[in-house]
A protein has these predicted regions:
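Long, charged, glycine-rich C-terminal linkers/tails
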Residues: 256-266
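Catalytic zinc-binding patch centered on the HExxH motif and its immediate surroundings
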Residues: 74, 233, 264-282, 289
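Residue-level detector of transmembrane insertion/anchoring sites
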Residues: 108, 248, 272, 295-296
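Short alpha-helix carrying the canonical HExxH Zn2+-binding catalytic motif
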Residues: 295-306
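Acidic/His-enriched low-complexity segments
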Residues: 1-258, 284, 289, 301
């Protein structure tokens, strides 16, 4: 049994075998409280005739197709790995699975707000947990472009690394309610652990920053509905813009991504996470009462660090 840990030797061998190009990830967040639908199309090159594996942690794998040929999940999926043999020079792998919502801050975390019963989701992938949401070569040096398509209840906001597109109306998977589907633009090549999905009835305030190269960068600050009266968005956005200006001047490099959202999320198991263009912060940084100066300073340090 291979287990769920990746060794350095395995990572080195896999990097020498495959080169990742792109992932198309389709997620259905309307299937209930325990699992969500995940379909991944991974495109990659490989040494012809070679073998490797792709990572996935899922309670159910429905189907696996490699270069048009079906593979039996019972034969090729073990622990957190899907074995891939007799690879071609150019490969397309399609994996359809049910993945599990988490309550430990790994993968796609699900939280129900006791204040109003609303449900919130956010991802935390650093370092080995994007495999809990989609099939992926889970190591930072195998970068690729990611295209996310997300179906969620119609009352939800959905955020990712690329700017949020206009959603298409649809129905929930069981046809019992209204939903909408977001098709996000492909990202630049990046490591899987800095990709992100945030979904739920988050409430936000938006602004803009003019980057050093003249681009207008959209900014957003979001939190759950029950905390919005406490969110000092003006101060957070002002600090963010001053931080951008300082770092662009210091490093003589403009901001690299197309937008910059900051989402303050519940039950976060760290201070924050620098997902590309979609940063998550623990919502303890939304102060419910007048904070001491040290807490304000700590939040500022975290925002500028990310």
């Amino acid at each position: 049994m291979p287990g769920q840990n990746l060794t350095r030797l395995e990572a080195t061998k896999r990097s020498a075998t495959v080169h990742t190009r792109s992932y198309d990830v389709v997620l259905d967040l309307t299937r209930g409280e325990t699992v969500f639908g995940s379909t991944t199309t991974a495109r990659f090159t490989a040494a012809p005739g070679s073998s490797t594996f792709i990572d996935l942690v899922a309670p159910t794998v429905h189907s696996i197709t490699l270069n048009g040929l079906p593979l039996d999940p019972a034969e090729v999926y073990e622990d957190s790995r899907i074995a891939l043999k007799e690879l071609a020079a150019d490969n397309e792998l399609v994996v359809t699975a049910d993945c599990a919502y988490m309550h430990t801050g790994e993968g796609l975390h699900r939280f129900t707000d006791p204040a109003d019963g609303e449900t919130y989701l956010y991802s935390q992938f650093e370092v080995p947990d994007s495999r809990r949401v989609f099939a992926v070569f889970e190591q930072p040096d195998l970068k690729a472009s990611f295209t996310f398509t997300v179906t969620a209840p119609s009352s939800w906001t959905v955020l990712s690394n690329s700017p949020a597109p206009e959603p298409t109306p649809t129905e929930t998977s069981d046809g019992s309610g209204d939903a909408h589907t977001f098709v996000f633009a492909p990202t630049e090549p990046m490591s899987s652990y800095v990709t992100a999905i945030v979904a739920g009835p988050y409430v936000g305030v938006t602004d803009e920053y003019v980057a050093e190269d003249g681009r207008t960068v959209p900014l957003g600050v979001y939190c759950r509905k029950s905390l919005v009266e406490h969110m000092d968005s003006a101060e957070i956005l002002d600090l963010t813009k001053r931080g951008f200006s300082y770092y662009e001047d210091l490093f003589a490099t403009p901001y690299a991504f197309t937008k910059y959202d900051q989402i303050f999320v519940p039950e976060f198991n760290a201070g924050a996470m620098e997902n590309a263009g979609c940063v998550t912060h623990r919502d303890d940084y939304i102060f419910r009462s007048r904070p001491v100066e040290a807490r304000v300073e700590r939040r500022a340090v975290t925002i500028l660090h990310e």
